[in-house]
From Swiss-Prot:
Protein name (record): Serine hydroxymethyltransferase, mitochondrial
Family the entry assigns: Belongs to the SHMT family.
Pathway membership, UniProt: One-carbon metabolism; tetrahydrofolate interconversion
Lineage per the UniProt record: Eukaryota, Fungi, Dikarya, Ascomycota, Saccharomycotina
InterPro entries according to UniProt: PyrdxlP-dep_Trfase, PyrdxlP-dep_Trfase_major, PyrdxlP-dep_Trfase_small, Ser_HO-MeTrfase, Ser_HO-MeTrfase-like, Ser_HO-MeTrfase_PLP_BS, SHMT-like_dom
Record localization: Mitochondrion
PROSITE patterns noted in UniProt: SHMT
EC identifiers of the protein: 2.1.2.1
CDD domains (UniProt xref): SHMT
Gene Ontology biological process terms in this record: glycine biosynthetic process from serine; tetrahydrofolate interconversion
Amino acid sequence: MMLLRAARVPVLGRRFLSQQQLISKHVQEVDPEMFRILSDERSRQKHSVTLIPSENFTSKAVMDLLGSEMQNKYSEGYPGERYYGGNQFIDKAESLCQARALDLYGLDPEKWGVNVQALSGAPANLYAYSAVMEVGDRLMGLDLPHGGHLSHGYQLPSGTKISYISKYFNTMPYHVNTETGIIDYDTLAMTSKLFRPKVIVAGTSAYSRKLDYARFRKIADGCGAYLLSDMAHISGLVAANVIDSPFEHSDIVTTTTHKSLRGPRGAMIFYRKGIKKVNKKTGKETPFTFDKTINFSVFPGHQGGPHNHTISALAVALKQAKTPEFVEYQKQVVSNAKAFGDELLKRGFELVSGGTDNHLLLLNLSNMGIDGARLEAILEKINIAANKNTIPGDKSALFPSGLRVGTPAMTTRGFQEQDFKKVAEYIDNAVKLSIALKSQESADAKDVRSKLNSFKQLCDQSEPVQKLAEEVSSWVGTFPVPGEL
């Protein structure tokens, strides 16, 4: 028996060593195939102009935490109330993240709380809705083709429910004025009194103008609704005080953390605390209960263990957002967007609402002989990443008349106004090329998808497209990505 035990020791030692070697190697050694994909994506990001307004380049410090030991820990529950042991440092990280979030937006911890465990923006909205509504309650949000978001309850005019939120709740959209491109607050006020929603969402994903939060508050009060402001796209601008803040007028504020805020891919739900109202006759105080209902909705209502590496990385991003450099960055984001828009207008493009107050622009291509899907495709071929987008009046999200572009990502890489003017020139050239290529699409292509595939093949075969791609790649590659300086 002793001999058998002695013989097993070196065998177990070799097995243990083999396991340690497996988990201690870097990805290029363990999985060359995946490493090649990663390398290709790194190269694509460096040598492409990123115009998608919901994208950004996060900092190396944030990346340090995303790939850290913080991801190893399970921690269902909240700081001081976990269902697992060993969370003393996870508690510190989450509490620090919450404190920094409130501080960044100038919020009194006695009057506001924040949940930082939601995994991303759409789930965060669902969690917030579920905290204050029952299944079948009524919700109003900006219609998707008018600049809203799927998570605001999108359904087709026919009644087909696209977002599951429109299945859980009874949703009705509000719209922009199609002449001005500005939200039609008067019609919203009238409709909300008839529809009587439980929640009105003040938030957008493709709307380039400021939101009138005071007007939203008045409308919500007029129909007895909660006002939920979704500032996912503009949270960085709000933090830097370069655009109006929703907090003064809102009951709940949700946001993603990876867009203009330039953090990891996560979300936050801010909610009011303290006294909601006081009965004038009896003096009885009615408190807000969001701290209980929203936190319960996140856990255990919808999620299990939070992503501690993301929460820790978010804490770092929130600290960086308090710096003067971040404020200057956000000012440049807006300045770049305005210069970008002005140059596009000079070149004959039409912009929904005529311009921008924030970080994005929505191009109306309906009178240019090309659609958003084809323009997105040819831009990708020349190393410019943008996205097709619906505009008011569009019937199809796959072949819409709009193109959405934004400035946060390339401003992070050092673009100034003159650089975005150059990008406008590239887009103009791409439109001219795409119109010519569209006329050459295969006659055998009968449906819209086949025609788009034919168009992409023509792009691949086009020498002018290839030449433009090389020019863009060479130019943008001179701008650093985070970590190169």
